[in-house]
Amino acid sequence: MNEYRSSLVFATPDLPLRDDVRRLGALVGDLLAEQVSAEFLDEIERVRTTAISRRESDAPPSTLSEQLAGRQPRDAEALVRAFSTYFQVVNIAERVHRIRRRREYQRSGTDTPQPDGLHDALRRLKAQGVTLDELSQWLPRIDVEPVFTAHPTEAVRRALLEKEQLMVASLVDNLDGMRTPNERASDAARFRMALTASWQTADSSPVRPTVDDEREHVGFYLTQVLYRVIPVMYETLEHAIEETYGSVPALPRLLRFGTWVGGDMDGNPNVDAKTIAGTLDAQRRAVLDRYQKELWQLASLLSQSTTLVQVSGELTAQLERYRALLPDAAARSRPRHGDMPYRLLNDLMRARLQATLDDADGAYAAPSELEHDLQLILDSLQANKGLHAGWFAARRLLWRVRSFGFHLARLDVRQESSVHARAVADALGQTDWDAQDATQRAAVLGPYAAGQDPLPRVDDEGNARLDAVFAALADARTRHGADALGSYIISMAHNRADVLTVLALARRGGLVDDAGAVPLDIVPLFETVDDLRGGTGTVQDLLADPVYRQHLAARGDTQMVMLGYSDSGKDGGIAASRWGLQRAQVELLEAAAELGVRLTFFHGRGGSIARGGGKTSRALDAAPRGSVDGRLRVTEQGEVIHRKYGIRALALRSLEQMTGAVLLSSLRPRAPEPREARWRPVMDLVAERSTVAYRAFVGAPEFMQYFRLATPIDVIERMTLGSRPSRRLGQDAALSNLRAIPWVFAWSQARAVIPGWYGVGSGLQAAVDAGHEETLREMAQDWPFFRTFLDDIAMVLSKGDLNIAELFSRLSGDLHTRFFPLIRDELALTKGWVKALLQQQSLLQHDPRLALSIRLRNPYIDPISVLQVDLLQRWRATDGEDEALLRALVACVNGVSQGVQNTG
């Protein structure tokens, strides 16, 4: 048996996955024969066989190119969609297999808890000496907050998400070993129905989504998935604590959610004060509607009659107060429910929620009032033999109210520093504002930021737009409460003047509380390598500024800093980005501690490794000691949201993993490693020389022309994927002006994945040449940061394909001979040292399940990529005007994304 096929060996626990993949693959074949033709299915089989043979012999893709070249756009699109449909069912099968494995762990009992879950985390903590008292003291400090962001390369439509959930549900039902043959046939029919409907649904919308569309998309995950699983998360934690320690303390809220959709103005002219207000209103309606529906369901359960059981005096008193508060609603109560106090109170609680929606008399002033009502019901049920008569359902609703409040998710607002600077310069009439250094600007801004002098108002678009934003935030704080608002993030923050500028603008916009303070958490986002290096100085200057320190005192002496993984990688390469982020956290923590401020980090991670993606548990294990301290705030983007939160069971697993990782990192951080003092200079050298190689490549003359020819970036820019443009508005096509997401997406499509590894080999070679090979091996063995870094690079390399990348590169004409040899040589150097330092014969040798997943997909991605190159060449020959070819190319982009499970 050849090497390729012999490597596709499923471990015993994964044999059910193999069976599912085979069964669903056959179902895809039936679908293609029915929806297109038997001849089309035969053609797909011929292409598939050729692709597998190429992989087995490690041959160049020329045989595939000959077979696929010159197809009519409609035929090409159908072929691509056929392979994409295979990826769709394989991805679903793998997700359902994760559910299967989770159930197997749960059935086996707590002697073998699932790795990285809550049971596993608590058992490890107890083994390290953490007592129940210590755990109880830490729990109120735990704050885990995934923040959902709009993603300009998200390639999954809402209509397809819903059908995917139907397919998942049918497979999950089929896991039940008690299903009858008829029931299994029904499951298969449901799957086939959803799959066929998906085939008949276009992969992409013909129009660019609006901010409202993006908000609805994120709202789907919040209201349809996470709303359902939040109570289960807390129940799982209680069970894990009881199993580990024997008793359970009262649990505080540990989880909440944030969003950027509707508030991220950076480079997006479609986001403004109106979308901020509209988003907050829409989220309020969505979550209050869920509460009303759940209370309605609860009412039918809480039908206890006072002729049979008692209720608490506190509940009776509350019922009387509500009758007086809402006489019209009380009058509508049905007489036959007169002996059912829980149901009567429930009716009036729903009436109060409706009044809250309508801003009418009798509205709840805050979520805490609804929590109080639910707690009254719980206490009364517990005191009157009702633990098994509705208490469980009422408690689940209470956990939801604690988690989602009346706002569903906290809304962040983000804008670039230069936008604020231009507005202030215009307001002050200072044409040389940019020429002044940060100290000079801070001195000018001080009186305005402190509220001593009003910042002048001027009648121009930039100032009016910002005034409207801060006025909207002030109104939102009054209407929705402080909990509805997250942070104000300054992208491309460079110095303290950038922060003081926002403080001054907020005051002018009316965002001031009764005490005269600005009730806003202002968060600088350090994105470039240089800004990460200078971030410590910026924060030190900021915390030493008396005006800002007074503002911070009103915010609890807690400062948040956001770390940008995307632009730092685009700027200096992945090695410099990762090391710069690591060093920045250490230095920022030390600076904040010296000045008596608690510093928390907001991690701006993306889906790909090049943008900070990867497992949260491993990332936190590799993070600097003390950098978590009970809190995790991290962006969740695009396909990451889909992958982690698209299915309820996997969403629950994701929340458990994050919470468990935060508990482990906070309660028992790694002991200080004295060898790090010796390792850091070596990593400095790796990062420095890696950056030199990376910048020499991307900074070479005509590189941007090469990039635009050797990747499908021009197709991506034409796709209707998000409301935000791929380049910063009004700027040219230079690399610095291209956003990180399409940069990574384009290289991922071309299968070169440059942002995820380029320069690493040169950096490692430089360290070896300097005599540090044994130190590097020691670092790979014993330093979680470095080991995780190498593992991530190995994963990226495994998803790339040099042969396919060469096909794309040849589209650049003469530039191919200049740039592709650099890619080939750096790839060989990087791959060689990564394998050597990880002591592996092949990439991902330590993770056979991931390796199998990638190898399973590659032969099916290859035909799409080869076809993409052919179509791209033909489309460009029409100056990008052939819409049929463009549609086929868009199908290719979606297909490759499904296959590699990665966009930007």
UniProtKB/Swiss-Prot annotation:
Hydrolase as UniProt keyword: no
Gene Ontology CC terms, in alphabetical order: cytosol
GO molecular function, one term: magnesium ion binding
GO process annotations (BP): carbon fixation; oxaloacetate metabolic process; tricarboxylic acid cycle
Keyword terms, alphabetized: Carbon dioxide fixation, Lyase, Magnesium
Signal sequence interval, chain numbering: none
E.C. designation(s): 4.1.1.31
Domain of life: Bacteria
Coiled-coil segments on the chain, per record: none
Active site: 151, 570
Pfam families: PEPcase (PF00311)
Keyword Lyase: yes
Cofactor: Mg(2+)
Reaction(s) catalysed by this chain's protein: oxaloacetate + phosphate = phosphoenolpyruvate + hydrogencarbonate
Alphabetized SUPFAM superfamilies for the sequence: Phosphoenolpyruvate/pyruvate domain (SSF51621)
PROSITE patterns from the UniProt entry: PEPCASE_1, PEPCASE_2
Root EC class: lyase
Biological function: Forms oxaloacetate, a four-carbon dicarboxylic acid source for the tricarboxylic acid cycle.
Similarity field: Belongs to the PEPCase type 1 family.
PANTHER family on file: PHOSPHOENOLPYRUVATE CARBOXYLASE
NCBIfam families: PRK00009.1 (NF000584)
UniProt-recorded name of the protein: Phosphoenolpyruvate carboxylase
Organism: Xanthomonas axonopodis pv. citri (strain 306)
Gene it is expressed from: ppc
